[in-house]
Amino acid sequence: MSTSATHVVSSKRILLSVGVILCFCLVFGVSLIIFEFNQQWMLRIHLDPILPNWFWSLINLFGDAWVVLLILLVSERRPGVMTSWILKTWLAGAAFVQLIKYLSPMPRPANVLGKEMLTLIDHPPLFSGSMPSGHAFAAISCALILVTVMKQRGVNQSYLWMIAAFAGLVSWARVAVGAHWPSDVIVGVGLAFLVVALTYVWETRSSWNHWLSSKHGAVLLVLIHSLIAVYLLVPQSDFLLVQIFQLSLACLSVSKAIYLIKVSLWLRTT
C-alpha cells in the first residue's frame, strides 16, 4: 500500500484516537476492580438472568477466535482482498491477549465468587487468566474490520451499526456465561481497537495480499480452513441447537476450502 504523507497523517490520527479509547477502557476497567463494582455487577447479572442459557451459548460462539477468523475470511469477495489485514490482526491479537493474561493472571469470577453464585454456561474456563477477554477482543476486532471495509464499499450506515451492536452483545456474552468479569470485556474491547489500528497501519506499509492471492497463498488458506473445520467439529456447547450451528460452520469452512482448491487448480492451468 501507499506510504504517502497523507497515509502517515491518517495513521497518526487513527493511533491517537485509538489511544484515547484504550485509555478510557483501561481506566474504566481498573476502576471497576478497585471500587469492587466488578463483583457487584457480576452478581446482579447472574442473580436474575434475562435471557435463556441457550441464547448466550449461541451468541458466545461468535466470539470464538476460530469462528471470527472464518467469518472474516468468508466475507471476502475473493482471496487477497483483506486477507493480509485479517491474518495480521488474528495473529497479533492472539499474542497480545495471551501475553497480558500471562503477565497479569487475574482470577476468574467463579474462583472468587464461587460456582454456586453464578450461572455457568458451557463449562467456561475457571483457572486461566481472566483479563482481557479474548472473545471480546475477537468480536470487536471482527466488527472493526468489517465496518471499515463495508464503509469503504458504501454500505448503508444502519448495517454498520447493527454489526457494532451485535459485536457488543457477543462481547457481553462472556459475562453472561460466567467466564469473565465486566472489566475483562471492557479491556478486551480497548485492546481490539489498539491491535486493529496497529495492523491497519502495518497493512498500509507492507501487505501480504499479493502472496496470499498466489497459488502458495491459496494452499495456506486451504490449510487454515481445514484447521477451522476440524476445530469446529468438536462440540463446544451442551445445547443441541448450538452444536448443529457449529457443525454448519464447519461445513461452511470445508466448502470454502474446496472453492479455494478449485481456484488454485485454475491458477496452475493459466
Feature map (PLM): residue ranges:
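Membrane-embedded catalytic cores of phosphoryl/pyrophosphoryl-handling enzymes
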Residues: 120-266
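Alpha-helical transmembrane segments
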Residues: 16-30, 89-93, 163-168, 221-226
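Membrane-interface alpha-helices at helix entry/exit sites of multi-pass transporters
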Residues: 55-57, 84-85, 154-161
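N-terminal transmembrane-helix/juxtamembrane module of multi-pass inner/ER membrane proteins
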Residues: 1-67, 99-128, 263-270
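Interfacial segments of alpha-helical transmembrane regions
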Residues: 15-19, 72-96, 160
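Small-polar-interrupted transmembrane alpha-helices in polytopic inner-membrane proteins
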Residues: 87-106, 158-174
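Hydrophobic alpha-helical transmembrane segments
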Residues: 60-76, 135-146
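Loop-to-helix transition at the N-terminal end of transmembrane alpha-helices
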Residues: 46-61, 87-90, 184-189, 243-248
